[in-house]
Amino acid sequence: MTDADFQNWLKRGGRFVALVEVQTSPVRYLSTVAYTTLPTDTPANRVYSPVVAGGVALSESLPLDGSATRSGGDIEIHNEDGALDGWLSDVWTNRRVRVFVGDVTWPRADFRLIFDGIAAGLESRTAGRLNITIRDKLQRLNTPVSETLLGGARIMSKIRKFLP
């Protein structure tokens, strides 16, 4: 599919679907409506669970001073029956999240990537819903490189001996 074909599809409106892939263990394949990849797709016959409520909310800013800013958003998940409550005990922080858009009739390869970032976490803000907080990849710079702490009382007492 060419860029022109995709732009034409956006203008005329089709059977829109957003596909969300979250690299948790196991990988979560989510969508706004039921979608299964075609037998000729790679990977073939992958099922995306139709649990995404509405769309994907993203916000961005472009500071005039050229500084880097983090963008973020939210993906709301249907969980009215509580079937996905177990997800709350999974590790979601810093897991890759990719969001694609396309038409439900298209092969997976024709979908367009609209977001490639990370999850900042999963929580439940209201009854019957889960929320995946998403951030751009700059969020990875906001985590410790090492869990090792330098310093401490013992080391500081030795350093103080050399201070005036």
Question: Predicted regions span which residues?
Answer:
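Juxtamembrane "anchor/assembly" segments of surface/extracellular structural proteins
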Residues: 1-164
